[in-house]
From Swiss-Prot:
The chain crosses the membrane at residues 29-49, 65-85, 134-156, 168-188, 194-214, 255-275, 285-305. The keyword Membrane applies. Belongs to the nematode receptor-like protein sre family. Keywords: Membrane, Transmembrane, Transmembrane helix. GO terms for biological process: sensory perception of chemical stimulus. This is Serpentine receptor class epsilon-33. The keyword Ribonucleoprotein does not apply. It comes from Caenorhabditis elegans.
């Protein structure tokens, strides 16, 4: 959606990744209610996923600092959607009609919203910014996770004791600076539609190269660890780091296919709308592919790791995730399979040693 204002300021042209339709009000109300019901289920899914990932720690703290905010940022995306719904249903009144806007970008004057001023559109502009920021936070976020894994592989000798929180903090600040800059650039059309593709076109090859590098390095480490005649000594934390990197790659491979499927569906849908292959009301389905991405990406992450999967299946079916802290906590010890028990013991021992090394 493109908004052009008659004001002569540098912010007179606005580009928003939102859609509006010319539909009867009762139809819009029904669609919005259905969307809100599905979003509530999605909110529950995101809550449970974050709860499980934080409860069952299987990865290094630095990876958590970088990866979890990416999943948590879905909340800002859905806030942007709620703002859009409020404008669609005219809960936020305007002195003019917004009309139909189903093109992600256009230079056709007939499809551009012309207004005397941006008064009354401030919340819609803010919602559009949140959606732009979410998209590019994922693009740059994936790259920062790849860089963090490369650093973890290269500095395997003393990664935990020397880096602590400084390295992920720097990566997080850089990625957010780039994400916010791109979001503002697109919002005020300082970045064109072609330039908007450059970040993911650059990020994807670098991330793939990092993936291949980390895979080869850690598979080499694993072979060396299993070699009884090796001369190099691997500490418990280093062995854990190798296993963690390979576990991340296993999860990352599945997430890559999930994200690529998500991008492919969105891309094909936008192209179909642009070339009028499908009617404009199909835009409801296409835009919700973005808003409901946790059903694909979140479930892929939760179901790819046995420990997460077990806890996720238990928690997702109950609304009561957090227990009253004043109640006594009863620990139930269950007999588990040897492989899983060994993993848990090794993980707990590693984090105890790691915590002692940081004191």
């Amino acid at each position: 959606m493109i908004i052009n204002s008659n004001s002569s300021t540098i912010f007179s042209s606005i580009w928003l990744p939102v859609f509006f339709y010319v539909e009867p009000l009762d139809q819009q109300v029904i669609i919005s209610i259905l969307e809100l019901m599905i979003y509530l289920v999605c909110i529950h899914l995101v809550n449970v996923s974050l709860h499980v990932a934080l409860k069952i720690r299987l990865f290094h703290r630095n990876l958590y600092i970088l990866a979890l905010p990416m999943f948590g940022m879905w909340y800002e995306l859905i806030i942007g959607k709620f703002i859009t719904i409020a404008y669609r249903l005219k809960l936020l009144g305007l002195d003019f009609e917004l009309g139909e806007h189903t093109a992600i970008w256009t230079n056709d004057p007939g499809k551009v919203l012309l207004v005397a001023s941006l008064n009354g559109l401030e919340l819609l502009i803010f919602g559009g910014f949140l959606q732009w920021h979410y998209m590019y936070s994922w693009i740059f976020g994936v790259l920062t996770v790849a860089v963090e894994r490369v650093i973890a592989s290269v500095l395997i000798e003393n990664y935990e004791s020397n880096t602590q929180n400084l390295m992920p903090a720097i990566l997080l600040i850089i990625s957010q600076f780039l994400s916010i800059s791109m979001a503002f650039g697109l919002l005020f059309q300082k970045v064109g539609p072609l330039s908007a593709h450059f970040p993911w076109m650059i990020s994807c090859p670098i991330s793939v190269a990092a993936y291949v590098f980390v895979k080869k390095v850690n598979e080499s480490f694993r072979r060396e660890i299993k070699n009884p005649g090796r001369k190099r000594i691997f500490t418990l934390s280093q062995q854990f780091q190798v296993k963690e990197n390979l576990r991340v790659l296993h999860l990352g491979t599945r997430l890559v296919f999930a994200v690529l499927s998500f991008i492919g569906i969105c891309g094909c849908g936008i192209a179909a709308l642009h070339y009028k292959i499908v009617p404009s009301y199909y835009c409801h389905l296409i835009e919700n592919v973005l808003f409901l991405n946790p059903f694909l990406i979140g479930l892929t992450a939760m179901l790819s790791i046995p420990q997460w999967k077990e806890q996720f299946m238990k928690s997702f079916l109950t609304v009561r995730l957090f227990r009253n802290r004043r109640k006594p906590v009863h620990i139930v010890v269950e007999i588990e399979e040897c492989a899983k028990k060994k993993n848990d013991v090794e993980t707990n021992l590693y984090f105890k040693q790691l915590a002692n090394s940081w004191i």
